[in-house]
């Protein structure tokens, strides 16, 4: 049929995620999200919680490492992840709980330290008050997690949501909308 997208969703290299084969016809999805990075997956989960049927299309194979752009998740994003039920699993991922998160500027890799931005380690994130973002009144402080760890966790939560269809190895090259959607 002219109005259907057909794609076989391959099993990602992630142990406990099984994706389904997808055949999505016009009208079976309310929203098309292009890109299964952190923003696309978060949007899909949020819409699905509200009963919106979402199809997420990604050019990469699921589980393929991303071109990393994220290394630190803000408090506001963590609050949203808390609302979506994914914050606890994100907090457990990334750097070890006692690993220093400070940002240091040096003249060279082993050169003179110019300045340091203190960021509490994961185990002290809720209690420590030293650093640029520790005084905020928030139930979810910022979290240091690289996108290579963040994305698989978001994918795992997104695929578990009713109303979310994930299609990988598919590139959107054109989009047409008419009076019917």
Where would I find each of the regions flagged by the language model?
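A conserved short coil-to-beta-strand element within the FAD-binding core of flavoproteins
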Residues: 168-181
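Active-site-adjacent segment of FAD-dependent monooxygenases/related oxidoreductases
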Residues: 66-70, 74-157, 176
């Amino acid at each position: 049929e002219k109005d259907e997208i057909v794609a076989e969703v391959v099993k990602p290299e992630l142990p406990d995620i099984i994706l389904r084969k997808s055949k999505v016809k016009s009208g079976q999805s309310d929203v098309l999200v292009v890109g299964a990075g952190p923003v696309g997956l978060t949007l899909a989960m949020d819409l699905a919680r509200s009963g919106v049927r979402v199809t997420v299309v990604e050019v990469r194979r699921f589980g393929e490492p991303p071109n990393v752009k994220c290394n630190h998740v803000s408090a506001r994003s963590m609050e949203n992840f808390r609302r979506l039920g994914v914050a606890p699993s994100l907090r457990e991922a990334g750097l070890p709980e006692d690993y220093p998160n400070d940002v240091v500027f040096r003249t060279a890799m082993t050169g003179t330290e110019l300045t340091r931005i203190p960021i509490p380690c994961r185990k002290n994130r809720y209690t420590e008050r030293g650093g640029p973002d520790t005084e905020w009144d928030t139930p979810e402080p910022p979290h240091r997690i690289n996108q290579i760890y963040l994305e698989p966790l978001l994918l795992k939560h997104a695929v578990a949501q009713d109303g979310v269809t994930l299609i990988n190895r598919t590139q959107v090259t054109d989009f047409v909308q008419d009076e019917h959607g």
